[in-house]
From Swiss-Prot:
The keyword Oxidoreductase applies. Belongs to the avfA family. This is Oxidoreductase mdpK. Keywords: Monooxygenase, Oxidoreductase. It comes from Emericella nidulans (strain FGSC A4 / ATCC 38163 / CBS 112.46 / NRRL 194 / M139). Pfam families: NAD_binding_10. The keyword Amino-acid biosynthesis does not apply. InterPro entries: NAD(P)-bd_dom (IPR016040), NAD(P)-bd_dom_sf (IPR036291). Disruption phenotype: Impairs the production of monodictyphenone, but still enables the synthesis of intermediates until emodin. Results in major accumulation of chrysophanol and its 6-hydroxymethyl shunt product aloe-emodin. One of its GO terms (biological process) is monodictyphenone biosynthetic process. Gene3D superfamilies: NAD(P)-binding Rossmann-like Domain. It comes from the Eukaryota.
Length: 265
C-alpha cells in the first residue's frame, strides 16, 4: 500500500492539533503528516508526542514562504487549510494567504512534474456564512455572530472564491461547522443541510479526514457541515468574551492592539 501523506497547515491551532491527534490514533507506518506551523517549539509543547514519532515532519516558517509550502504539500493526498483566527483581526488575510500560497505551490509542482497528482484541498470555513446551513440559527443571533467575526468571515469568503475560481484543476472541500469546543470526541456525521453547536475540535477533525478520504467524491466542491452523533460538546466558557471582543474589533478597529486574544476553550 502506498504511503498516504497529509499536509496540515495551521498545526498549532485547535483544529490542526486535533487533525494530527486523529491521524496518529493509532500511528501507522503507512501514513505520514507534514505539519506546517509558524512556531515549532509551540507545536512540540502542545503535542510533545511528536518528539518521539517518525510519522510527522514539521515545516516552520511563514505561510507566504512559497518554497516551504511547496515542500510541505508535495506528494500529499490532502491539504488541510486550517490557518485562521478566533479573533476578529482587522484586515485579516490568514485564509487568503494560505490559499494563495498553496495554489501557487501546486502550479509550481505541476510545471515541474506534469503527471503529479493534485491533492484535495480541505478548507476550514464556517456555517455562519452559508445561507442554507445557517438558516435555522436564531434571527437575532446570526447578525451578531457575523459582526463579531466580520473580518475573519470576509477573509474566508474571499479564500473560498479563490478556490472555486480554480475548480477546473483543483478539488476543494469546504468544511463549515458551527460553534466549536475543546472537548472529547463523541462521534460525528457530515451533513449538507444541518449545523450544530457545539462540536468538539476532535470530532471536527475526524469529519475533515472522512471527507478528504472519501473516494466517491460526494463532498468534492461542496459546503459540508458537521453534526454530533454522541451528544453535544460542552459550551466553551470563552465564547461570550470572544463575541464581545469581536464586536469591539469590528466597531473600533483602532483598539485591536489593546484588546486581548480570545477563543473557545
Amino acid at each position: 500500500m502506498p504511503l498516504a501523506t497529509y499536509a496540515v497547515l495551521g498545526a498549532t491551532g485547535n483544529t490542526g492539533t486535533a487533525l494530527i491527534q486523529n491521524l496518529l490514533s493509532p500511528p501507522s507506518s503507512e501514513m505520514h503528516i507534514n505539519a506546517y506551523c509558524r512556531n515549532k517549539p509551540k507545536l512540540l509543547n502542545l503535542l510533545p508526542e511528536l518528539n518521539d514519532t517518525k510519522n510527522v515532519t514539521i515545516f516552520e516558517g511563514s505561510i507566504t514562504d512559497l518554497s516551504l509550502i511547496t515542500a510541505c504539500i508535495r506528494n500529499t493526498r490532502a491539504v488541510f487549510l486550517t490557518v485562521t483566527s478566533n479573533d476578529n483581526i482587522p484586515g485579516c488575510r490568514l485564509s487568503q494567504d494560505s490559499v494563495q500560497t498553496v495554489l501557487e505551490a501546486l502550479k509550481q509542482i505541476r510545471t515541474a512534474e506534469p503527471n503529479a497528482v493534485v491533492p484535495k484541498l480541505v478548507l476550514l470555513s464556517s456555517a455562519t456564512i452559508d445561507p442554507h446551513l445557517s438558516r435555522k440559527m436564531p434571527s437575532w443571533f446570526l447578525p451578531i455572530m457575523k459582526t463579531a467575526a466580520s473580518n475573519v468571515y470576509a477573509d474566508l469568503i474571499k479564500a473560498e472564491e479563490m478556490l472555486r475560481a480554480n475548480e477546473s484543476w483543483v478539488t476543494s472541500i469546504f468544511i463549515k461547522p458551527a460553534g466549536l469546543s475543546v472537548d472529547i470526541q463523541r462521534g460525528h456525521k457530515l451533513d449538507f443541510d444541518e449545523q450544530e453547536s457545539f462540536i468538539s475540535y476532535l470530532d471536527l477533525a475526524a469529519a475533515m479526514l472522512e471527507a478528504a478520504n472519501d473516494t466517491d467524491g460526494r463532498y468534492d466542491g461542496r459546503n459540508v457541515s458537521v453534526v454530533n452523533t454522541g451528544g453535544k460538546a460542552r459550551f466553551p466558557p470563552g465564547t461570550p468574551k470572544c463575541i464581545i471582543v469581536g464586536l469591539l474589533r469590528h466597531f473600533f478597529p483602532g483598539l485591536h492592539r489593546f484588546l486581548p486574544t480570545t477563543g473557545p476553550s
